[in-house]
Amino acid sequence: MQTAYWVMLMMMVCITAPLPEGGKPNSGIRGLVPNDLTPQHTLRSLISRRQTDVLLDATLLTTPAPEQRLFCFWKSCWPRPYPWRRRDLNGKR
C-alpha cells in the first residue's frame, strides 16, 4: 500500500511541481517532502514506519494497564472498549 502511495505521490509531484527560474526538479520537489524523510530514507520508509509513528507506539506500549491503551487505526486513536468480549459466553458461540 505504501509503495502505491509513493508512486502516486511522485507522479503528482512530477506533473505539478513548479520549477524556479533555471532550477532543477529536485529543488521544486524538496520543499514538498517532510523534514525527516530524506532521499536516503525513502527506501527505508517504504518498508518501515516513520519515526513519529514508532514513538507513538512506544508511548502506547508503556501504558500500565492493557485496558487503558489506545486503539489506533489510520492514525486515529481512541480508548479501547472494555471488555472486548462478553463474559457470559464463556468461550461458546
Curated annotation (Swiss-Prot):
This is Consomatin G1. Residues 1-22 form the signal peptide. Disulfide bonds join C72-C77. Coiled coil: none annotated. It is found in: Secreted. Consomatins evolved by gene duplication of a 'Somatostatin and related peptides (SSRP)' gene expressed in the snail neuroendocrine system. In addition, this peptide adopts nearly identical conformations as in the somatostatin drug analog Octreotide. As this drug, it contains a D-Trp at the same position, whose synthesis is a common strategy used for enhancing the metabolic stability of compounds in drug design. It comes from Conus geographus (Geography cone). Keywords: D-amino acid, Disulfide bond, G-protein coupled receptor impairing toxin, Secreted, Signal, Toxin. Belongs to the conotoxin C superfamily. Consomatin family. Potently activates human somatostatin receptors (SSTR) with a specific activation of SSTR2 (EC(50)=2.6 nM). The cysteine framework is C-C. Its main location: secreted. The modification D-tryptophan is found at W74.
